[in-house]
Amino acid sequence: MKYKRIVFKVGTSSLTNEDGSLSRSKVKDITQQLAMLHEAGHELILVSSGAIAAGFGALGFKKRPTKIADKQASAAVGQGLLLEEYTTNLLLRQIVSAQILLTQDDFVDKRRYKNAHQALSVLLNRGAIPIINENDSVVIDELKVGDNDTLSAQVAAMVQADLLVFLTDVDGLYTGNPNSDPRAKRLERIETINCEIIDMAGGAGSSNGTGGMLTKIKAATIATESGVPVYICSSLKSDSMIEAAEETEDGSYFVAQEKGLRTQKQWLAFYAQSQGSIWVDKGAAEALSQHGKSLLLSGIVEAEGVFSYGDIVTVFDKESGKSLGKGRVQFGASALEDMLRSQKAKGVLIYRDDWISITPEIQLLFTEF
């Protein structure tokens, strides 16, 4: 079995009727495929949108609401209804499911990150299928484009999944918009996510969901940089999940980096919030970015911000102004300032094990398109 642990992300457009309401037949089809894969020995996590779709009708809305408060209220009602659909269908096959609601804070805060990881590990080891969604009823930012796309990549990286599958209404990444460009061709295998790939991702998408192709590509960066390959395929075929697990489904496959980031490096790269800035000379910049060395005090030109021992800072090349990466400091700002002022600074500010270089691929995650 090539892909034992698989994270599936199902978007709103793959769960709804034409009027935007939840399609029970589509939910049933998804759970049947999950059951078949589970019975075949796969460990599965489902990141599912659809809470708003499941709830807005129960609150008397004629169509999917657009106001934040209405969305939150609909999500609060719909989350339970959506989980009930999944749970009922899975129990028919004697499979236990579990609801986990996450927010970005569960990844930023290291203690909460550890707790979430431990809970997911126990559930998978016990044969349950975790069903994950963002906590849409309380988190405003997470209702924006890309919410569960990013979440699924973060979860896949956290549990060191063997594969992340995006099920959507578009069967992969195209060179153009397949809905309007007859010359558009699907890319079957993507070795590296770069600016050209990002440009291609501005095309096809659906009006019902909040996740477009661009957010899936940026989410794929998180996964592939963490060592998890990604597959984007259509949810319209009845056996798409099974075929994706067997690599027989048509779609776009994103190759994982051979040396994926371990958990500590993932946290530094994608979640750790910087408390200050450090500018270094050319020698220190080369030592960090090209030779994998620690950052010595002697290579620091200046520092900015209020930070303490153990905080995360961003390091810049003074000459080019380029961001080099992030790391955990061994001295607070005031102590560092005193040492730099003495002009006899010796020692290490950031050890290489507490450092992550910002690759061009990771840098794309922090670029607005």
UniProtKB/Swiss-Prot annotation:
Q: What is its main location?
A: cytoplasm
Q: Which superkingdom is the protein from? A: Bacteria
Q: Can you say what this protein is called?
A: Glutamate 5-kinase
Q: Which InterPro entries match?
A: AceGlu_kinase-like_sf (IPR036393), Asp/Glu/Uridylate_kinase (IPR001048), G5K_ProB (IPR041739), Glu/AcGlu_kinase (IPR001057), Glu_5kinase (IPR011529), Glu_5kinase/COase_Synthase (IPR005715), Glutamate_5-kinase_CS (IPR019797), PUA (IPR002478)
Source organism of this protein record: Streptococcus pneumoniae (strain ATCC 700669 / Spain 23F-1)
What gene name is listed for this protein?
proB
Similarity section: Belongs to the glutamate 5-kinase family.
Q: Which Pfam families match?
A: AA_kinase, PUA
Q: Where is the PUA domain?
A: 275-355
